[in-house]
Amino acid sequence: MKQPLFITFSGIDGAGKSTQIDLLCASMSAAGARVTRLSFWDDVVAFSAQRERSSHRLLKGEVGVGSPGRPVARRDKNVRSWYLNFIRSCLYLIDAVRLNIVWRQHRRRNSDVVVFDRYIYDELANLPLNNVLSRAYIRLVLKFSPIPDLPLLLDADPSLAVQRKPEYPLDFVHTNRQAYLALGKIEPSIKVIAPALIPEVQDQILKQLLALRAIKGQCPAFIAFLAASPIANSQAQTM
């Protein structure tokens, strides 16, 4: 039984992950691929509803998703203290265990591609990566966590990201972006997608997929949905 291709999308809030996931899943489905889309928060994270309620109650932040016409002042991952980092570290270990279970389940299911909206990387980027103990802990969790076939990190300009999704202070988003980039140096398999317009980001993702095809040429499902995609064919001819 052929195993599915695992693709993950990570990045700061407002980086455009949902847009690119929608576009990629739609194009792969149109090409005949059986695509499973998972939300790390909804499908992997342990006690997600309880954690959200507790965070709102204790940290007094607003709930909801921010939009240009409706800013939301969230207080959760942007609140930093040693005891919150300790609690997060404990919870992230549980999430890593859950991730392995979910990963094994979907390896055996009838899908060609499994796409994660966020991944364990998005949690680890909430920790202080400038701390030696935090980096050691992160390496431990990464060693224990499954490595996706294509882990994508969508980089973005923090100012534009906050305009698109006003939920956190700009200074925190700058700090969070640097944490993601630092995490990419700890885990070299992460592919950083440079900030750009939506079609240009699509092109960068496509190039990563085509490069992956060259490495995993033995994967029929992967080759099938790429070969059937008109966008992929035109891009391949220009590379």
Region locations from a protein language model:
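P-loop (Walker A) phosphate-binding loop of NTP-binding proteins
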Residues: 12
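Hydrophobic positions on the alpha1 helix immediately C-terminal to the Walker A/P-loop
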Residues: 20
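Conserved lysine of the Walker
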Residues: 17
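Short beta-strand-centered segment that lines the nucleotide-binding/catalytic pocket of NTP-utilizing
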Residues: 31-47
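A glycine- and Lys/Arg-enriched "phosphate-lid" helix/loop adjacent to the NTP-binding pocket
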Residues: 113, 118-182, 191
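ATP-dependent small-molecule kinase phosphotransfer cores
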Residues: 42-129, 136
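Hydrophobic anchor at the beta1->P-loop junction of P-loop NTPases
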Residues: 9
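NTP-dependent small-molecule kinase module
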Residues: 159, 163-239
